[in-house]
Amino acid sequence: MLATILDGNKISAEIKTEVAAEVAELKAKGLTPGLAVVLVGHNPASEIYVRNKVKACEMTGIYSEQHTPPDTVSTADLLQLVESLNRRNDIDGILVQLPLPKQVDSKKILLAVSPEKDVDGFHPMNVGYLSTVRPGLVPCTPAGCMEILRRSNVPVEGADAVVVGRSDIVGKPIAMLLTNANATVTICHSKTHDLPAVCRRADILVAAIGRPGMITPDFVKPGATVLDVGINKITDRAEFEKFFAGDAKREAAFAKNGSTLVGDCHPKVAEVAGAFTPVPGGVGPLTIAMLMANTVKAAKLRRGNTV
């Protein structure tokens, strides 16, 4: 029996509708939440992602603006831009699109973003707020994972959760969010002994390692909920066959585009899991939806939640 598909597109649309209603209420009180996106140079993938963010802002009624310094920009000039956005009262959220060019000190730039406008949730102050369960801005993808669980009525309290991957952007924050929700959490990584055995203990398994199809059915407890955070592009025909042999729909898309996306979980995991997020269309759509939610949250937190 195949797993229940947890539809990220549907949940993302629900969240955007809720955000739009919240923005309309704020506008009636004279406040329009504002998001500034900084995109350095012309990275095609980043440009697509930023276009999607701008489109989401238009859908939800959030004011947005783009700043596009050249890829020759210096750290000092980029700092000056970030600091000017920090000072503006009409901007509630600042997002610096990564990666930045090699000559730019990325860490210095991200630390320069005011914590109250850090809608990516990467600033150490927001990380501290998350770890101490205080109101702050939470990284978008982990927050989206929690929304999938909540809106799909997956029990978290008392559940055994295993997070494969310990990145600052996904692995560590989702582990903290699950802990805060009273799950019993194990974080796994490249040095974990007998990874499949550890994963098989999980009622909730989160794969966030950036390795295509690494989590195979033998990693999964029957009936577990699996959140696949990975988005990996495959262009090699032999690798495609490993994951999607016999899948006519994927085959047609691969033949047309010369590539396809696969998560960190092998598609056959869906034959063992009880519920499963597909790639694409699972966790991915939630990232931008939660960015919109974070922008509204920042607008409220900056004003002491009095709006």
UniProtKB/Swiss-Prot annotation:
Q: Signal peptide: which range, if any?
A: none
Which reaction(s) are listed as its catalytic activity? (6R)-5,10-methylene-5,6,7,8-tetrahydrofolate + NADP(+) = (6R)-5,10-methenyltetrahydrofolate + NADPH; (6R)-5,10-methenyltetrahydrofolate + H2O = (6R)-10-formyltetrahydrofolate + H(+)
- Name one cellular component (GO) term: cytosol
Q: Might you give the EC number(s) for this enzyme? A: 1.5.1.5, 3.5.4.9
Gene Ontology molecular functions: methenyltetrahydrofolate cyclohydrolase activity; methylenetetrahydrofolate dehydrogenase (NADP+) activity
Q: How does it assemble?
A: Homodimer.
Pathway annotation from the record: One-carbon metabolism; tetrahydrofolate interconversion
Purpose: Catalyzes the oxidation of 5,10-methylenetetrahydrofolate to 5,10-methenyltetrahydrofolate and then the hydrolysis of 5,10-methenyltetrahydrofolate to 10-formyltetrahydrofolate.
Which family does the entry's similarity section mention?
Belongs to the tetrahydrofolate dehydrogenase/cyclohydrolase family.
Q: Where does NADP(+) bind?
A: G165, R166, S167, S190, I231
What organism is the protein native to? Koribacter versatilis (strain Ellin345)
Protein name (record): Bifunctional protein FolD
Keywords linked to the UniProt accession: Amino-acid biosynthesis, Histidine biosynthesis, Hydrolase, Methionine biosynthesis, Multifunctional enzyme, NADP, One-carbon metabolism, Oxidoreductase, Purine biosynthesis
Keyword Amino-acid biosynthesis annotated: yes
Recorded hits in CDD domains, A to Z, give: NAD_bind_m-THF_DH_Cyclohyd
Q: Which InterPro entries match?
A: Aminoacid_DH-like_N_sf (IPR046346), NAD(P)-bd_dom_sf (IPR036291), THF_DH/CycHdrlase (IPR000672), THF_DH/CycHdrlase_cat_dom (IPR020630), THF_DH/CycHdrlase_NAD-bd_dom (IPR020631)
> Which terms does the UniProt entry file under GO BP?
L-histidine biosynthetic process; methionine biosynthetic process; purine nucleotide biosynthetic process; tetrahydrofolate interconversion
UniProt cross-references to Pfam families, sorted A to Z: THF_DHG_CYH (PF00763), THF_DHG_CYH_C (PF02882)
